[in-house]
Amino acid sequence: MNNPFTVKRMMTLALTAIMCAGALWAEVNPKPFVVPELKEWKGAEGHTALSGRLIVKSSKLRRVAQTLASDYEQMTGKALSIVSGSPKAGDIVLALKGDKTLGQEGYRINIAANVTLTAPTTQGVMWATRTLLQINEQAEGKGLPKGIITDKPDYRMRGFMIDCGRKYIPISYLRNLAKVMSYYKMNTLQVHLNDCGFRKFFGDEWSKTQSGFRLECDTYPGLTSKDGAYTKKEFIEFQKLAEEYGVDIIPEIDAPAHVLAFTQYKPELASKDYGMDHFDLFNPEVYTFMDNLWKEYLGGKEPVFRGPRVHIGTDEYSNAKKEVVEKFREYTDRYIRYVESFGKQAVLWGSLTHAKGETPVKKENVLMHMWSCDYANPADMKKEGYQLIAIPDGYTYIVPAAGYYYDYLNCQYLYEHWTPAVMGRVTLEENDPCIEGGMFAVWNDVAGNGISTKDIHHRTFPALQTISTKCWTGKKTTLSYAEYDQLRKNLSEAPGVNELGRLGKKSSVVLQKSTVKPGDQLDAEEIGYDYAVTFTIDGKQEAKGTELFRSENAVVYLSDPRQGKLGFERDGYLNTFNYCIPANEKHTLTVEGNNRMTRLLVDGKVREELGPKPLYIIRPQNKANYQVKGADVFVPEVYEPNDYISYQRTLVFPLRKAGQFNSTITDLKVEVK
């Protein structure tokens, strides 16, 4: 007869063994890939499918919830309804919850039966939503991996500076850029509003040299650039959008050097010793001019510059004479205090080692960019009491197609070796309280070199992801660079943003159309690097200016406005192939493009490649003459190649709208190469 106790005990042991075996086979979720890398992850088992409901526990988070819902729908095509009540399975919950260990930007996410995002501040919850969206876009239909995230940044300021003075950057791009920065938890965008090109490329005449001031100005009518500028209204709206996404905008008016836009407007302000790109600091009118200019954007109940900080410039002024150095220091101190009188924190380029002197310069609550140890030694500036922002030129400066600094940042080196504690040849202690954070910069030094906003973004995006990681996660990254670099490419730029023009995977056909009729609207705005666009054309006579395709950013011409050739226009530059569409002939054309060139193939054979083109300066001192002079010697007018612009002829191919052409276009095929 069986013993009931023994049977029960055996059943219990068997059940325990089964449970243990199951536990051995169960997988705890690994840390999700996010940029910047998550600080802490406690994995659990299983996945959570989202319900499509979003519960907000505080009215202060209403705006964050609306942004999350909008972004989620843009990325997935599914609605996220903001509702009240108790959470149900799969709901997303946003809540404010005090926690001193998380600071101002830290947050927690608990992915369990539902998904709860908590932080002490709205900014922290905003960053939590960015993490959630990144994880969700990689979920591949499995749901969100269960686990607990605890995350906060190593450094308070994580940013980027873009030079809009030498090249006009459309406000539409700046708005998208703010969204991209937010998606990667970059919280500071500095907009460099004025600057000038190199005089040597403009006939060595200051009056002809490119300059730009990119903001509407009532105080000085005519100061605003005519080749592209921002109205006050659109600049304010841009800042408001950035605020919604957790990004501070720092407007920069750079002076007392880099001021050619101001001295071309009012020549008497220019230095006679150091060139028109320098103010004459001994001229009282300089201070009246700058006081009034700053007041226009900082004064009033609703100032144009909305954020807590503004940048007063102060880089690269001459230190040739002691009296000039002292005057420069006086200027710097004056405008630190002047912008503070409007309630703003002053930010400036470090120059006080270069301009070492006796005139005191305010240091309390002043942010200084550490861009060059020769101009401002970080160790000395720390002793002085400045708050430091690491933006070392030898690591973090992009100057597109210039031949110096970086065309693309060395992201592998930055990922493996750099943090904001590394300020060039001087390295401070990691997380030193004097270090506010780190940034990188795009300087459009070579005005007129054909670089497009798309080219700038192609350089910016990988750098932004990497600098974001190193400012947030610091030395605590766990992935190799190869792993990180492969995975980061799978992430979107931001919800609803596709400045790179990515349409599909490599070596895939992403769009086909048997016949393209005049005025047709296509499903894609554009295709970015690397691509091939192929079509068959039965040519007809086309008027100059006849378009094939157009987007918001570019136009491809069947017959360009000047010569009637196949060509393209973007960013104010017109480039043409040495090819006219033959009337009454049928050919297959392919346009291939990458970040270095645009190539035309006719019937499968390369016709022409538009790559970087050197455009040389012709100067009398560069004239070549190797002949022995005599009465009957004729000397050719030829010049040694010396300084030149590397002119870029790239194209992100427009696709949105077909033009009004006479030719017949068939068999359109758009490929990712």
Spans of features found by a protein language model:
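Short, aromatic/His-centered strand-loop micro-motif at the edge of beta-sheets
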Residues: L566-T588
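Short tryptophan-centered beta-strand motifs in secreted/extracellular beta-sheet-rich domains
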Residues: L189-V191, F235-A242, V533-F535, E585-V602, ...
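Extracellular glycan-recognition modules
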Residues: S508-E569, G659-F661, I665, V670-K673
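Flexible, acidic glycine-rich loops studded with aromatic residues
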Residues: P360-V366, C373-K513
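Acidic, contiguous N-terminal accessory segments
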Residues: T12, T16, A26-P153, A346-A355, ...
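Active-site neighborhood of glycoside hydrolase catalytic domains
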Residues: F262, P267-V366, W371-D380, E384
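Feature activates predominantly on carbohydrate-active enzymes
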Residues: T101-H278, E285-Y287, D291-R309, Y338, ...
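Flexible glycan-contacting loops in extracellular carbohydrate-active proteins
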Residues: E609-I665
